[in-house]
């Protein structure tokens, strides 16, 4: 049976802490990877630290969102990082941008999976309307997932509440679910959170 994939969010700039996290989470019982966002990537020697990780599955969560040429150039600028398994871009950047990112990523490293972020888990239906959206989060996610599929991305990032909906649209794509919390955990600035069990039951390919 295929092991369920869990990415541990390394949302810190403390490299010693991350080393301890990696050491203490090594196990054959679970399929563990490590997610590095812009906080760590832009920190002093963050990129260098990531480049030196060996035999670890690295999820580079840069959430790129710009014009096609700029995003493509940004991907090309990290071509020296040969250990990246997953890379994120915002689907709101549009079809042309997604297509450009996919093309360049496969050119520099065929193993990279490009994931399209739909709606951040920090948004609720009420808060997303405050920035100009008129449709529900599920409707927005559905539309953006369809664009990501058209651009031939490898996967989608969405909250656990949209997974079942996207399984019907993107049945052969990876579906990565962030905003994972255990019952009773503080949710911080997150709005759409879910337990690991419920996310996997809904059909998530991996959780963060």
Question: PLM features: residue spans?
Answer:
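A C-terminal functional module that forms or caps the active site or interfaces directly
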Residues: 36, 40, 44, 158-207
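Structural motif
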Residues: 28-29, 81-82, 151, 202-203
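Active-site-proximal loop/turn and secondary-structure-junction residues that shape catalytic pockets
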Residues: 12-14, 38-42, 64-66, 93, ...
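Residue-level signature of catalytic and energy-coupling elements of molecular machines
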Residues: 8, 63, 148, 199
